[in-house]
Amino acid sequence: MDPNTVSSFQVDCFLWHVRKRVADQELGDAPFLDRLRRDQKSLKGRGSTLGLDIETATRAGKQIVERILKEESDEALKMTMASVPASRYLTDMTLEEMSRDWFMLRPKQKVAGPLCIRMDQAIMDKDIILKANFSVIFDRLETLILLRAFTEEGAIVGEISPLPSLPGHTDEDVKNAIGVLIGGLEWNDNTVRVSETLQRFAWRSSNENGRPPLTPKQKREMAGTIRSEV
């Protein structure tokens, strides 16, 4: 196993532990708590994939961080922080909408690269909006935290989430997954639109009807997925 993979996991475990202590002291805001909950699932998946114990990894990560901090000067820390571009966290959904449990009458699930797409095939003839919480850097979608499909009544009927065992995805991965979800929902005569915020930062454009400008390749993939998966 690559030692850098192990050390990266160890440091991530320790930093999650520190963030959890911050949350326990009620010092974290809603985006902070969102990321904490999602990262916990990701770490469990990575630990299972790597065959590493999280508690042991956390202790090892603490030693790595302590060693680095002893070597780090305040001036070097300031320069490092100044050179790193800051990402923004955008929220279409409230904390309640993100954390709410939901179930499917006719469940369908598909893995598209590092993302998992879930939808309820029992939903028909509904107006649906896709909302997402995600981070943005350089005015472009950086990391999807969670996307959910809501009916006008507020019911959750679909979802796109990162796979804990496959961390890391691109904006193209997200757009392709959205295309698959839209196609699956429209197969049952639902009308689907995407939130203006998500359109703006994923596609850098927005349409009044809420439809993102899917590429011909995405349309072909969407159509093929509908025929074979839904």
UniProtKB/Swiss-Prot annotation:
Upon interferon induction, ISGylated via host HERC5; this results in the impairment of NS1 interaction with RNA targets due to its inability to form homodimers and to interact with host EIF2AK2/PKR. A motif (Nuclear export signal) lies at residues 137-146. It is found in: Host nucleus; Host cytoplasm. Residues 180-215 are annotated as: CPSF4-binding. Residues 1-73 are annotated as: RNA-binding and homodimerization. GO terms for cellular component: host cell cytoplasm; host cell nucleus. One of its GO terms (molecular function) is protein serine/threonine kinase inhibitor activity. Residues 223-230 are annotated as: PABPN1-binding. The keyword RNA-binding applies. The dsRNA-binding region is required for suppression of RNA silencing. Inhibits post-transcriptional processing of cellular pre-mRNA, by binding and inhibiting two cellular proteins that are required for the 3'-end processing of cellular pre-mRNAs: the 30 kDa cleavage and polyadenylation specificity factor/CPSF4 and the poly(A)-binding protein 2/PABPN1. In turn, unprocessed 3' end pre-mRNAs accumulate in the host nucleus and are no longer exported to the cytoplasm. Cellular protein synthesis is thereby shut off very early after virus infection. Homodimer. Interacts with host TRIM25 (via coiled coil); this interaction specifically inhibits TRIM25 multimerization and TRIM25-mediated RIGI CARD ubiquitination. Interacts with human EIF2AK2/PKR, CPSF4, IVNS1ABP and PABPN1. This is Non-structural protein 1.
